[in-house]
């Protein structure tokens, strides 16, 4: 089935959203409250504060635990030493099974604020009043790598959000890419087994550049759409703060009276989208594999709270096949030209976890955490996730009571007949754990659509048909939308996609797999397939135009749009302790940029007053812009190793690797970053072969308002794409 865009629908993008017109019904009985304070009040019940306290055993008795109990100073340790046994036993059992996927992650608390009363489209209480606040917890993650892998692996990135609503927990368990690799959850083990390390040698970690991954991709072409997104900048974002988020599946909104709409969830970063380039990501991974979790933590600690807007695309139940594809297919997007996004509210992350394990590691998200006003669809991937995400927690937590952990507890009372199990934290007072009953007034009572504000399934949902094991014919076209994505990228980002696929398949050993990859790419775009083929030693194919089209859609790339905020970006000023003007210049620049949330870091040969870090600990990957200070140009002389030792090379120093200052400048330019120089520091640009006439290169005699404004504009551009060669 070929994706066909309906021209008459394009005008919808400019229409006023019908769900934001007129006076909406109010739910005045719901109070706002201070969601941030509520989070602290709730979690503080579970804090353990060791300040000014004596060491105790797990049962509270004061102890000392620095030496084992032995029979004499040189004798054997005694089995009766309960202090030793407790300490070692607890250490032996500290680890729990890591997540099968999304093991590597970072989280933060925050607040969601509703933009209005949306009770005309959903009965969800957290969207029932303008200004209503709801505590949230978000966990960002990679998918394939283990808990100890790098943040910078090329991967889909998880974006899971929990709303602690006044009607229970609601989770949007999404990603930073709006589609997924497979259409049916029964293929999930096959997908993950294919992308995980080999079973014989556990290689490679957190990478798909190997035979089994691309063998699966080329045999299961539903993967192509997500694959192209992952090979683009979306696979290697600048930070968690600079990604959008998506619910992936189509869900339902349901009103109090049972009317339903189909919706797709979108998180739009109010920082803007930004990505690294591949070599930059690889270097960052080697130098600081915690780069992204550190960026998120540091931004929140500095009070630069990242924000996202939550929106939905709203469609009628009858629209499931309207756009030329199936809304139940999780490998498809709904272009915003077809259905604009209705903004529902804003989320701000403003509080770091106090303990990583207790909060970020123990939090469990699942798409089955929904509330009144939200309902599922028949998306076969979603249906399978509803089982898998709940089931896996039994393995991770060793029992069914994981919802009782503080990070997982709802902020409202829990009343049901579930009892006992390992790790039961509560003391139920109702001895009659069954329903229906006459005791205790029949409590807990049944809540439904009309009584008790209970959850209810959309009344209009129906289904019929024969029992089959088959893919719906409406799911069959898996090439038109990958082409839509590829068509919509700017030339440089198309090149990044091509280079990424070349890199991955250059590591594939099987010529059969490589050839199959080219067959699938050729169904998307002949130029894409040919450019990859010639780099990996496969014959260039003739066009296979069945699914070719020239359609494009907006805002699917990570390049070509400016950042909305500069919060937490870093400018590295490359100076010298031999020239005090370096410190003065960095200080002046810091004053000019601080109101925009930009950090200025002065780098010099050694630590001294005003110097933030040394060249020995610095690389271009740490900065979003690089500026050479006046007087530091002697450190940037082009090094030569012919006919002499490293000590005799120009610009050499025993304080840092030879040529490090010049390398920082060159790499900054190569990675598309803003670069600049002050006064005599422009000589460093010449030594690096960087023309001052290039876009994103700024020079001035001293730090002026114009120079600072140029740097800010360069930071908003983020990557200057003319520095990256494109195939011809």
Swiss-Prot record:
InterPro entries: Catalase, Catalase_AS, Catalase_clade2, Catalase_clade2_helical, Catalase_core, Catalase_haem_BS, Catalase_immune_responsive, Catalase_large_C. Its cofactor is heme. Residues 16-27 form a propeptide. Residues 1-15 form the signal peptide. It comes from the Eukaryota. It is an enzyme of class 1 (oxidoreductase). Heme binds at residue 389. N-glycosylated. The active site is at 102, 175. It catalyses: 2 H2O2 = O2 + 2 H2O. Keywords: Cleavage on pair of basic residues, Glycoprotein, Heme, Hydrogen peroxide, Iron, Metal-binding, Oxidoreductase, Peroxidase, Secreted, Signal, Zymogen. Its EC number is 1.11.1.6. GO terms for cellular component: cell surface; cytosol; extracellular region. It is found in: Secreted. GO terms for molecular function: catalase activity; heme binding; metal ion binding. Glycans are attached at residues 120, 448, 551. SUPFAM superfamilies: Heme-dependent catalase-like (SSF56634). GO terms for biological process: cellular response to hydrogen peroxide; cellular response to iron ion starvation; hydrogen peroxide catabolic process; response to oxidative stress. PROSITE patterns: CATALASE_1 (PS00437), CATALASE_2 (PS00438), CATALASE_3 (PS51402). Its main location: secreted. Pfam families: Catalase, Catalase-rel, Catalase_C. Homotetramer. Occurs in almost all aerobically respiring organisms and serves to protect cells from the toxic effects of hydrogen peroxide. Belongs to the catalase family. This is Catalase B. It comes from Aspergillus fumigatus (strain ATCC MYA-4609 / CBS 101355 / FGSC A1100 / Af293). The lineage of its organism: Eukaryota, Fungi, Dikarya, Ascomycota, Pezizomycotina.
